[in-house]
Amino acid sequence: MNLAEICDNAKKGREYALLGNYDSSMVYYQGVIQQIQRHCQSIRDPAVKGKWQQVRQELLEEYEQVKSIVSTLESFKIEKPPDFPVSCQDEPFRDPAVWPPPVPAEHRAPPQIRRPNREVRPLRKEMAGVGARGPVGRAHPISKSEKPSASRDKDCRARGRDDKGRKNMQDGASDGEIPKFDGAGYDKDLVEALERDIVSRNPSIHWDDIADLEEAKKLLREAVVLPMWMPDFFKGIRRPWKGVLMVGPPGTGKTMLAKAVATECGTTFFNVSSSTLTSKYRGESEKLVRLLFEMARFYAPTTIFIDEIDSICSRRGTSDEHEASRRVKSELLVQMDGVGGALENDDPSKMVMVLAATNFPWDIDEALRRRLEKRIYIPLPTAKGRAELLKISLREVELDPDIRLEDIAEKIEGYSGADITNVCRDASLMAMRRRINGLSPEEIRALSKEELQMPVTRGDFELALKKIAKSVSAADLEKYEKWMVEFGSA
């Protein structure tokens, strides 16, 4: 009997039950229960046989629970069909015969027994008609409708207060609260999704948290940070750049650079991916793009970071391009071109900077490449950068006195920033792995924190380097350098 097959069938039965595929789950449960039954017949040891029977009993209980769920769902299917035809048959007879006669009758308005919005409007028309006839009949209807008119006045005052509050929020004059974007004309769910999933204010990433990349930091300061500090200087031909494209292999710190820009500027940071700006409904993706840029202008100064922009704005006109994808690209290009134009006459400090990152710059559309006026290369870390990155990654870990980070930095040449972080993480776990080797779960739980806080040694790094290889090849680096020679704009 294959024990691995028994475990696999039990696991699949539980997974299918969690996913709601109860029929498949019941099949796996039946199979594993029969397998355990056959396995128990071949066991001679009573203690082991008792444990297997206990496991079989637990699986039987789970199987019964799944069966009860299936029977409950089946009962819903049986009970629902007769309910709907009854209601559908009742409504056609009730609506034309009962409701139409009282609706045109205007005698129900004066008693004011109920006060829905439907009855308030006829009352206003009656009062206007009475006033037109003469002042004689004015006292009687007014005395009967004092309370509704008072409630309307209160509603109007409350509405006025809400409008004033909204204006104050937009002007930033309320009591230190963050202004709220008014998504009039857009679906409320779309606005809430962008607010919830994209907007992150004051990300806590600073320049010092990023090792090396001094040239990239310098250019980003000039393109984004300095126009915020010197708005009077960056005007006319010196206007801020519309967009910056960061090109480089994966794991070199492009996303962290964008977050550092948002932190140093004190701007609102929009982190956008292809899943954020796509929808299965026709025309909704373009609305999301337009809504994103309108929200960015509202929360200005703003940094819009579009990660993996090649997945959104690949080349147009290819044979496999879909119409919906083309419309999204067109809307994005229009909005990006409109960022500078919309802000030329506004306060220069209220700018919207578009940062983009990609690992495949050769797939980007030509029109988008023109709008991203600065195109900078984010390379692999240098020897100095690798040593700095090791210090940043290991600042919370105790190191052995014999470790020299410069020697380790020489051994990890060709590693990206993400690769180096993985090496540091794996090396910092080596001491813990040695300490818990051979211990039972109870003994592991009983270990104190001091026993696990052991220094990282040189041998730990050597073991980690044997397990983790670099993720970027020399051929990839050559492609990036060739593209930068042709299209770079640093």
From Swiss-Prot:
Residues noted as binding ATP in the record, renumbered to the chain: 248-255
Disordered: annotated span: 96-182
One record GO biological process: spermatogenesis
Chain positions found as Phosphoserine: 174
EC number from the UniProt entry: 5.6.1.1
Top EC class of this enzyme: isomerase
Gene Ontology CC: centrosome; cytoplasm; microtubule; spindle; spindle pole
Modified sites of kind N-acetylmethionine: 1
Biased composition annotated in UniProt, kind: Low complexity: 128-139
Family as reported in the entry's similarity comment: Belongs to the AAA ATPase family. Katanin p60 subunit A1 subfamily. A-like 1 sub-subfamily.
Subunit structure: Interacts with KATNB1 and KATNBL1.
Entry protein name: Katanin p60 ATPase-containing subunit A-like 1
Annotated organism of origin: Oryctolagus cuniculus (Rabbit)
This protein's encoding gene: KATNAL1
